[in-house]
UniProtKB/Swiss-Prot annotation:
One of its GO terms (cellular component) is cytosolic large ribosomal subunit. PANTHER family: LARGE RIBOSOMAL SUBUNIT PROTEIN BL17M (PTHR14413:SF16), RIBOSOMAL PROTEIN L17 (PTHR14413). This is Large ribosomal subunit protein bL17. GO terms for biological process: translation. The gene is rplQ. The keyword Lipoprotein does not apply. It comes from Desulfitobacterium hafniense (strain Y51). The lineage of its organism: Bacteria, Bacillati, Bacillota, Clostridia, Eubacteriales. Part of the 50S ribosomal subunit. Contacts protein L32. The keyword Ribosomal protein applies. Keywords: Ribonucleoprotein, Ribosomal protein. GO terms for molecular function: structural constituent of ribosome. Belongs to the bacterial ribosomal protein bL17 family.
């Protein structure tokens, strides 16, 4: 299986990952579970690569996935130019220990 189901049906999982990707690009750092971070990591990498292309078609593709237009603008004007000379590896995942309620492994995912 090429992806994690994360205990959700298809629509809920897709919405959750879109929200996480939008939040990560907006705040440049979020705290979530390890499984969610691994999934959103791939999405964020693809969005930043789209931002590096910089053309109108790439912007429209990013708009279909990210939920906020100002986040897409930030992606294309601030985030993507920062990684112009970097070939992938735009995010970093740092373990922060188990969550108090259910001992789920929590991580901090941030843009490098």
């Amino acid at each position: 299986m090429a992806y994690r189901k994360l205990g959700r049906n298809t629509g809920h999982r897709g919405s959750m990952l879109r929200n996480l990707a939008t939040s990560l690009l907006k705040h440049e750092r979020i705290q979530t579970t390890e499984a969610r971070a691994k999934e959103v990591n791939a999405i964020a990498e693809k969005m930043i690569t789209l931002g590096k292309q910089g053309d109108l078609a790439a912007r429209r593709n990013a708009l279909t996935y990210l939920l906020e237009e100002d986040v897409v603008t930030k992606l294309f004007t601030e985030i993507a130019p920062k990684y112009a000379d970097r070939q992938g590896g735009y995010t970093r995942v740092i373990k922060v220990g188990p969550r108090r309620g259910d001992a789920a492994e929590m991580v901090l995912i941030e843009l490098v």
